[in-house]
Each structure stands twice: as structure tokens, then as C-alpha cells.
Amino acid sequence: DAALLNQQDAPADDKIDIFLVEADNALKYVDTDYTAPVKDLGITDADLSKQYQYTKDIVTDSKGVLKGVSWQGCPGVLFYNREAAKDVLGTDDPDEVQNYVCDWDTFNDTAAKMQAKGYKMISSVNDTYRVYSNNVSSKWVEDGKVQVDDNIMKWVDDSKKLVDAKEAGTFDMWSDDWSKGFYPDGKVF
């Protein structure tokens, strides 16, 4: 950030030409003069036609101008315990299991079924955060004011319900206890 703020007075060889940004912070830079339209670099829509749209959306400014490109796409995926699926849902077939997690209301209903049979739906409420946070419709800060997107509040509400009902664990992501959920003895869907 400091280097970007000093662009005007920086010697030519010290000016930033290209910088990497994590998707979580992209919106901080997209609607600023610190970023330029990708088309100004000679990169065309045709050049980017096979990129996933979501990788372009995150770096498109409020005027619809593409200000960045991604070198990777990280799809969301749900890994599940097939034994738990058979035990609780009667099937471990991915097409059938999809019906039990097709939206948040159905996911939460399935969590109650899992809990009734002694399973947690997830090791941590943080396991679902990215799905909610990557589908927000507003910035965290607008006109100098912090705003919390409705989708983040839905995550908070859903997470609290899952924890209160003992349908989700509260382990720190990447911790040993969280990781145990990936094994049969972990009793996590």
C-alpha cells in the first residue's frame, strides 16, 4: 500500500507496474486510480474468453471495467464422508447427495439429520465461510463506512444455529482437531 501511495514521487525504476492481490483484497484496489484497465495493456476480451467469469468479476470496477486477470481458478467443492452419507442419507452417490446440500436451507436440514445420527455436518463453521463471502454483492467499505453484506450476516446466523444445535464443530481451521473430521472416527459428514 505504501508503495502505491508513493507512485507519483517514485523514480521511474521504482514505480509499480504489476502487483498481485488476493481476491479478499481485490475490491480495495479495483475502484482506484492505482489500477488501469486491462485493455490498456493490449489484453482483449477474446484473450480472456476462456477464463471463469468469477475470476473476472472480482477485479471488475463499479463502472464495469476489467482491472485485473487471474492466473488460477479455485472451484468450490464439497468433500463428504461416504460412510456418513450412506448411514444418514441412505446413499453415497454424488448426484443423490447433492440433493441434500443443494442450498443453505437444505444443507441445514441435513445437518440436523447428521446430528441425530451422531455426526457433525462440518468440523468448523469456517468451512462454509468462503461460500458465503465469495457471493456477496457489496464492498466491505463504501464511502468510508463499513458495511456488512447480507450474505455475511446469513453465514453468522446459520453458523450460530449449527453450533447451538451441536451440528457443527468449532475447531480452528487447519488444526489437528479440525483435520480429524476427515477420518471415519472424526464423525464429520
Regions found by a protein language model. Give the residues of each.
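Short helix-initiation/N-cap motifs at beta->coil->alpha
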Residues: 1-5, 101-106, 171-184
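Extracytoplasmic "Venus flytrap"/periplasmic binding protein-like
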Residues: 1-51, 65, 87-88, 189
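Extracellular/periplasmic catalytic domains that process cell-envelope and extracellular macromolecules
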Residues: 10-14, 29-31, 59-63, 70-72, ...
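Beta->alpha turn/N-cap motifs
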Residues: 21-25, 125-128, 176
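Short glycine-centered helix-capping/turn motifs at secondary-structure transition points
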Residues: 33, 166-169, 181, 185-189
